[in-house]
């Protein structure tokens, strides 16, 4: 098994919970500005804390595409950063991100099955990714779940119970 860690980021969770942590309530995506490099640097730092000594395979950034596969300016910026791979679901007519959980599950399982990683850092709260966590663990991958304060109210209890470790990002 490769001595590498991969990071899996549900952008919908990151934006919703990040905006709530900073401003006290969830904000619409159009009202949020992301310092992409700072977030990627923090994700890399978190990966090193969770999986000390392992090299980073890459950061997988899962987000919804509006109107098909067009990248937003923010997504395009992220896609050009080193060590980042954008994976797109879609945004439905109600503005909800869809198809992202299945992409996370598929990538997590495939990287585990191929023995491409030994650790995974997951930034999500959705119970739908729990099956991917379970299967990756069956292949020997340790899964580190990262939440955004107050994560205990914003992450599935079953997902928290499945993770090997849990970490909470604070407001700062």
Where are these regions (language model features)?
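Domain-level signal for Mg2+-assisted phosphodiester chemistry and nucleotide/NA-binding surfaces
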Residues: 1-100, 142
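Nuclease catalytic cores that cleave nucleic-acid phosphodiester bonds
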Residues: 70-172
């Amino acid at each position: 098994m490769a001595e590498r860690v991969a990071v899996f980021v549900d952008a919908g969770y990151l934006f919703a919970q990040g905006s709530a942590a900073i401003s006290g309530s969830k904000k619409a995506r159009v009202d949020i500005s992301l310092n992409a490099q700072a977030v990627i640097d923090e994700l890399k730092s978190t990966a090193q804390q969770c999986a000390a000594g392992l090299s980073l395979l890459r950061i997988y950034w899962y987000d919804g595409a509006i109107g098909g596969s067009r990248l937003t300016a923010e997504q395009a910026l992220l896609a050009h950063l080193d060590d980042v791979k954008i994976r797109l679901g879609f945004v439905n007519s109600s503005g909800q991100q869809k198809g992202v959980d299945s992409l996370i599950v598929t990538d997590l399982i495939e990287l585990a099955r191929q023995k491409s990683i030994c650790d995974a850092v997951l930034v999500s709260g959705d119970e739908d990714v729990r099956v991917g966590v379970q299967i990756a663990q069956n292949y020997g991958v340790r899964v580190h779940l990262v939440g955004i304060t107050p994560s205990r109210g914003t992450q599935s209890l079953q997902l928290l119970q499945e993770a090997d470790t849990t970490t909470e990002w604070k407001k700062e």
